[in-house]
Amino acid sequence: MKQIDLNVDLAEGCANDQQLLQLVSSANVCCGLHAGDYNEIREAILWAKENDVRIGAHPSFPDRENFGRTNMQLPDDELKACLFYQLGAVKALCDASGVTMEYVKPHGALYNMAAKDPHLAALIAETVKSVDPSLKLMGLSGSIMLTVAEQHGLATISEVFADRHYLADGSLVPRTRDDAMVENDEEAISQVLQMVLEGTVPTVDGGNVAIKADSICLHGDGEHAVVFATRIRRELKEKGILVTSSI
């Protein structure tokens, strides 16, 4: 049986967290520097525990004003301290709640920069490994970040997107382009099924490119998020695809 993980970001101030946790298998818990606070983080962890959803930390650059979406150049020691601070906070709240923090998925600009920057990717991998070498690193499928993480001995989770278009090299179409997003639910569902069942993804030039899909990111913001997640879950079930974090 084919299997796939569904992940969603939590504790970012969206009203859909509890509903989405009934539909996904992994939760990326905001660490408080791009959104959220200690109480929202604690609540998200408890809700995830209640729904038997795998928990990961979702650290960012210290950029609350721009929701962690601004590229930043921090000294290595400062960025490491920033990451230790965030991972330590979520791990401690998980421990206090009787659950395990199992993986790390960088957020926003940190995620996108590390996907292409070997030095930044290595810094993230070293920090994650120092916190707990059993932690997995979730990142863009086929990216430098995952390659570097594996070189550092970390297990990785290859993430793909239901609502993003892809270039011929397997990278995401930049958000600055008008065709970055998949706006139509039918197209998004078709793309998800192709990635899971065939191991390829359509590209904006009309072709297809091979892609490894361990986990699908479902964006949780917006009123449509729960409706879309419900439909994705139903379509996967109808195709005999098991939704699970045990990838």
Swiss-Prot record:
Keywords: ATP-binding, Hydrolase, Nucleotide-binding. The keyword Metal-binding does not apply. Its EC number is 3.5.2.9. Disulfide bonds: none annotated. Gene3D superfamilies: Glycoside hydrolase/deacetylase. GO terms for biological process: carbohydrate metabolic process. It is an enzyme of class 3 (hydrolase). It catalyses: 5-oxo-L-proline + ATP + 2 H2O = L-glutamate + ADP + phosphate + H(+). Belongs to the LamB/PxpA family. Forms a complex composed of PxpA, PxpB and PxpC. Catalyzes the cleavage of 5-oxoproline to form L-glutamate coupled to the hydrolysis of ATP to ADP and inorganic phosphate. This is 5-oxoprolinase subunit A. It comes from Histophilus somni (strain 2336) (Haemophilus somnus).
